[in-house]
């Protein structure tokens, strides 16, 4: 009763059990509490993958030594180690052994088991000198920390390996159907129609990336420096083809961050007998959370408002499209035609660019208007039919002439009459 009154008074004065008792109360059979002297008799060492429990044989602090064989760790009856010391008993077990249970909390992994003291009667007598006791054992490991006693030593990936990993990005440029759902199977288009182009990058295991079309130049051959040429996209993402009498533009919004779609009015090169077109575009990616700027943008020219508008970001990033001064360190191919205008390894010079590549779609066949093609086809068919008719007439005339000539010759041949004598 004295302990109960003291505990009640402490609770009223201090307002909590933690202030009243610095150690947990161990409950014996019958519910009788005893002060936490057992904690000073039991020591637990939590290692990286195991725990070590050291128990004083004077478990209850009464001077009465317990027997080592009366102690077990966990319900699996893990026995103590053999020790030459007479005053302590030691257990050593893996974290998953001796009935250890693991509990995951918000900030820790808690492994718990119990140390059991089950006294046996004194040999030859039916009496006990000590009480039964259950001592909870816990090991707590922070979830956000280093479990090992050694410091973490990071291994940096070599630069060549990093580059190889980045180069696993796969860029593509495809000619699409009008609904953007499937790739167009036929490469043929006519003047007055629209070519639907889709640039895309397969990011694989990379973090989310945002794709940009830096520039695009069509040529009559796969050589991107060939002549004649025409510029569709320039100045790091300005679709300058929309400045001419066309409705070429980027599609808003994007279908995905790693995809960019744009339309181009079909054209052909003047004074060129070739109808094939190869479109080479320089594609690049940046982190998806990076804000578009003058070097990374997708801008279209709005003919109705006579202004530039971006696919995403602030409209100010498109302000340089009119002047062509978009932070480029070299002259644009739109300003001066030359082989060196396509920079190589630009990702090494601009740190904010993760990766980039030149991709080509073609050959695309851009013909005249479909109606013109129909007229030309009808004229060509008529000419073919006329030539065929004249040829047949000539053959018939020659055949008739040969027949007449043969008949004439047969009429002028003399006949010989043979008379037989009687």
From Swiss-Prot:
The chain crosses the membrane at residues 387-407. Expressed in oocytes. The keyword Hydrolase does not apply. GO terms for cellular component: collagen-containing extracellular matrix; egg coat; extracellular space; plasma membrane. It is a single-pass type I membrane protein. The modification Pyrrolidone carboxylic acid is found at residue 23. It holds the Pfam family Zona_pellucida. Proteolytically cleaved before the transmembrane segment to yield the secreted ectodomain incorporated in the zona pellucida. Polymers of ZP2 and ZP3 organized into long filaments cross-linked by ZP1 homodimers. Interacts with ZP1 and ZP2. Belongs to the ZP domain family. ZPC subfamily. This is Zona pellucida sperm-binding protein 3. It comes from Mesocricetus auratus.
């Amino acid at each position: 009763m004295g302990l109960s009154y003291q505990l009640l008074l402490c609770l009223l004065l201090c307002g909590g059990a933690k202030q009243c008792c610095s150690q947990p109360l161990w409950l014996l059979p019958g519910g009788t509490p005893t002060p936490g002297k057992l904690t000073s008799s039991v020591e637990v060492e939590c290692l990286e993958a195991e725990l070590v429990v050291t128990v004083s044989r004077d478990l209850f602090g009464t001077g009465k030594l317990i027997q080592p064989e009366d102690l077990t760790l966990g319900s699996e009856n893990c026995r103590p180690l053999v020790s030459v010391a007479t005053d302590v008993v030691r257990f050593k077990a893996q974290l998953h052994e001796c009935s250890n249970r693991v509990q995951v909390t918000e900030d820790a992994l808690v492994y718990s088991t119990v140390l059991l003291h089950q006294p046996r009667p004194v040999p030859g007598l039916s009496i006990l000198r000590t009480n039964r006791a259950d001592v909870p054992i816990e090991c707590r490991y922070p979830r956000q920390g280093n479990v090992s006693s050694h410091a973490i030593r990071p291994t940096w990936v070599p630069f060549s390996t990093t580059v190889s990993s980045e180069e696993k990005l796969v860029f593509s440029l495809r000619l699409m159907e009008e609904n953007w759902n499937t790739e167009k199977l036929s490469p043929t288009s006519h003047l007055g129609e629209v070519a639907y182009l889709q640039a895309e990058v397969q990011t694989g295991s990379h973090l989310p990336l945002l794709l940009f079309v830096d520039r695009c130049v069509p040529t009559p051959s796969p050589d991107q420096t060939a002549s004649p040429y025409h510029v569709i996209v320039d100045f790091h993402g300005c679709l300058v083809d929309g400045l001419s009498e066309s409705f070429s533009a980027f599609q808003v919004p994007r279908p995905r961050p790693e995809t960019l779609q744009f339309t181009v009015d079909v054209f052909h090169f003047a004074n060129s007998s070739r109808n094939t077109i190869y479109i080479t575009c320089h594609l690049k990616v940046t982190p998806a959370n990076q804000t578009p700027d003058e070097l990374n943008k997708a801008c279209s020219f709005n003919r109705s408002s006579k202004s530039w508008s971006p696919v995403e970001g602030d409209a100010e990033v498109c302000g340089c499209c009119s002047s062509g001064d978009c932070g480029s360190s070299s002259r644009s191919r739109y300003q001066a035609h030359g082989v060196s205008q396509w920079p190589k390894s630009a990702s090494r010079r601009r740190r904010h660019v993760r990766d980039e590549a030149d991709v080509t779609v073609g050959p695309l066949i851009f013909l005249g208007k479909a109606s013109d093609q129909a007229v030309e086809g009808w004229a060509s068919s008529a000419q073919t039919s006329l030539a065929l008719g004249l040829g047949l007439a000539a053959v018939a005339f020659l055949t008739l002439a040969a027949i007449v000539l043969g008949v004439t010759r047969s009429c002028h041949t003399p006949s010989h009459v043979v008379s037989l004598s009687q």
